[in-house]
């Protein structure tokens, strides 16, 4: 099997479909499952597999009814990986947020969906009364300007390749 990458587009220009499709599908399944695991959510791999197969139009011997939140996570991962060359906009990001929190809740906590946050945000760990603060996010009133700056950079930076931009974006927020 030969793999040719067109340097001007960072795209694989030829692969055997017989090998590529199953590898791509398994990679997507791992992306969805592992991304969710990082956030503390353990997903049923067969639900993820079925959702991906349906959305990609693949034949799958056991299509099963998938929970709405799994379909939402799959939608986000598919959009991010298949449409990475599209401009990243506020509307697209908020659409992803809506896909992830379709119920309007994060656990048992109601949240404002598909809009920038309006309150404070901290990343903490530890038991109640012994919390450790790892990060305090910028004030809510600064979020629109910070997001505009980020979107300007992510869409217009030509200095960095896509992998490095993804790493920088991860640390930006």
Language-model segments: residues:
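FIC/Doc superfamily catalytic core
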Residues: 1-173
């Amino acid at each position: 099997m030969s793999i040719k990458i067109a340097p001007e587009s960072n795209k694989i220009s030829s692969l055997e479909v017989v090998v590529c499709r199953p590898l791509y599908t398994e990679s997507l399944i791992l992306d969805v499952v592992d991304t969710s695991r990082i956030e503390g959510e353990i997903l049923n791999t067969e639900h993820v597999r079925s959702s991906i197969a349906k959305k990609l139009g693949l034949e799958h011997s056991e299509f099963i009814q998938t929970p709405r939140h799994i379909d939402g996570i799959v939608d986000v991962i598919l959009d991010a990986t298949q449409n990475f060359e599209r401009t990243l906009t506020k509307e697209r990001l908020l659409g992803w947020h809506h896909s992830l929190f379709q119920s309007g809740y994060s656990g048992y906590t109601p949240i404002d969906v598909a809009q920038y946050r309006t309150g404070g945000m901290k990343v903490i760990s530890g038991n109640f009364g012994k919390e450790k603060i790892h990060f305090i996010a910028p004030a809510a009133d600064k979020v629109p300007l910070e997001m505009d700056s980020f979107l300007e950079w992510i869409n217009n930076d030509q200095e960095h390749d896509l992998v490095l931009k993804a790493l920088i974006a991860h640390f930006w927020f």
